[in-house]
């Protein structure tokens, strides 16, 4: 369907320009994005990272059709009504839709659109394409220059000084957890300096425990 194709194109769009809009989505202006990002093909990303992200974010990724109904219900109640937990309900497909299409406003309408679009995206892209796109667009905090980074290649280069295809299992495990809270978990501050001992301990623990 044409609508599915348009959705795929929107999800794949990696723009260096950020659009500022009014509440009705009409355009205010366009500004250059400050994100450092280098999109790469799926075969240029280590399987270590792919496996780590699936294990961390969406263990049912290979089998679901875009959503996990029980998890969606639990997370929707948590985020909108304040009942239970609001975490753990979004598949990688839903997270990709949230980042690229619908945003993260805590409303039933937004969540419903996210679910419908996630199901549609799984019709238009295969699992490897969805995972690769997720890894190319997700925020990963800051690099060692203090610049905001998005995409696994920028994260690999900016944090470990290697390409995404060369990430080891411990490095991949560390990077896989960054999109959950990229600025908090980033080992670097806005000026490029190493952050607090607490954050560095997290990096050290993750690297040492993931052999």
What are these model-derived regions, one by one?
Residues 1-21:
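N-terminal type II signal-anchor transmembrane helix
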Residues 41-92, 144-160, 167:
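Flexible, acidic/glycine-enriched loop-and-adjacent beta/alpha segments
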Residues 17-23, 27-32, 39-41, 52-55, ...:
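Soluble periplasmic/extracytoplasmic beta-strand elements of cell-envelope proteins
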Residues 14-16, 36-38, 49-51, 68-70, ...:
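Envelope-exposed proteins and targeting segments
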Residues 4-7, 33-42, 56, 115:
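N-terminal post-signal-peptidase region of extra-cytosolic proteins
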Residues 92-206:
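Non-catalytic, structured segments within soluble enzyme domains
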Residues 2, 207-211:
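Short, small-residue-biased leader/transition segments that mark boundaries at the very start
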Residues 23-26, 33-34, 45-48, 56-59, ...:
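Solvent-exposed coil/turn segments that connect beta secondary-structure elements
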């Amino acid at each position: 369907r044409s609508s599915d194709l348009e959705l795929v194109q929107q999800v794949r769009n990696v723009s260096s320009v950020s659009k500022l809009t009014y509440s009705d989505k009409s355009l205010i202006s366009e500004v250059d994005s400050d994100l450092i990002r280098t999109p790469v093909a799926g075969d240029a990303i280590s399987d270590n990272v792919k496996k780590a992200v699936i294990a961390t974010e969406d263990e049912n990724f290979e089998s679901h059709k875009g959503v996990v109904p029980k998890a969606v219900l639990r997370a929707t109640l948590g985020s909108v009504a304040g009942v239970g937990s609001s975490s753990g309900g979004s598949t990688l497909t839903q997270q990709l839709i949230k980042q690229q299409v619908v945003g993260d406003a805590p409303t039933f309408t937004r969540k419903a659109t996210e679910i419908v679009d996630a199901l549609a995206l799984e019709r238009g892209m295969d699992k490897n394409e969805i995972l690769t796109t997720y890894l190319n667009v997700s925020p990963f905090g800051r690099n060692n220059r203090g610049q905001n980074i998005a995409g696994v290649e920028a994260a690999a280069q900016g944090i470990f000084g290697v390409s995404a295809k060369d990430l080891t299992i411990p490095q991949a495990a560390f990077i896989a957890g960054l999109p959950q809270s990229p600025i908090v978990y980033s080992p670097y501050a806005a000026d490029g300096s190493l952050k607090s001992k607490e954050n560095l301990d997290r990096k050290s623990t993750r690297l040492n425990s993931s052999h």
